[in-house]
Amino acid sequence: MKPYLIGIAGPSCAGKSYLSTHLARHLNAAMLNLDSYYADLNHLSLAERAHFNFDAPEALDSCLLIEHVRQLSRGDAIEKPIYDFKNHSRTGQTERLEARSFILIEGLFALYWEEIRAVQATKVFVDLGEEICLARRIERDTRERGRTRESVLEQFQTTVRPMAQRYVHPTRQYADVVLTGDGEIDDELKLVLNHIKVGSSRGSGT
């Protein structure tokens, strides 16, 4: 049986990863995070990397991402790149990801590319108010990615907000399930699992 692919998209810090972690645990699913596919910026200085627009689809290596998603959809394993967020570059190492019966594709642009949507049997959009997303992003990036509060605020105002409005929020139209990122996780899981149950009974894919 072909793997059942689930796309989980939404604005930064809306709760995509939290939902994905719980869903992956419930389904024993493989999880592919789009953050691993940011383009390698080793050719740029550290100052240039710091001002790079990471919030547009062009920031990702979409060719590699699409190829890897297609491989996983066929049941093949991939060598996923490892990205260093402190230096804004790839480490040069990879992590092997084996296909499983269920595969989660999670990230800002999980519903953006038609080629990826075409192999997703369930598409989820997680939405949340901008102020809460910003507060979560400040907390995450200062703790996990070595950023200052000021740099996070500047990035949010210059690229995160406008790019979300241009590229992320419009992909909500493709979602089978729309969730709020501050809802009860058990309730949100139930909504997604119900759609997966229906989709699985019809066969994976679209």
Q: Where are the predicted features?
A:
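Short hydrophobic/aromatic beta-strand immediately N-terminal to the Walker A/P-loop
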Residues: L5-G7
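The conserved Walker
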Residues: S12
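Conserved lysine of the Walker
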Residues: K16
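Hydrophobic positions on the alpha1 helix immediately C-terminal to the Walker A/P-loop
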Residues: L19, L23
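Post-Walker A helix-loop "phosphate-sensing" segment adjacent to the P-loop in P-loop NTPases
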Residues: R25-N33
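Conserved nucleotide-sensing/catalytic segment adjacent to the nucleotide-binding pocket
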Residues: A30-M31, A39, H43-N87
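ATP-dependent NMP and nucleoside kinases share a basic, alpha-helical "lid"
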Residues: T91-E144
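NTP-dependent small-molecule kinase module
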Residues: E98-A99, E139-T142, R161-T206
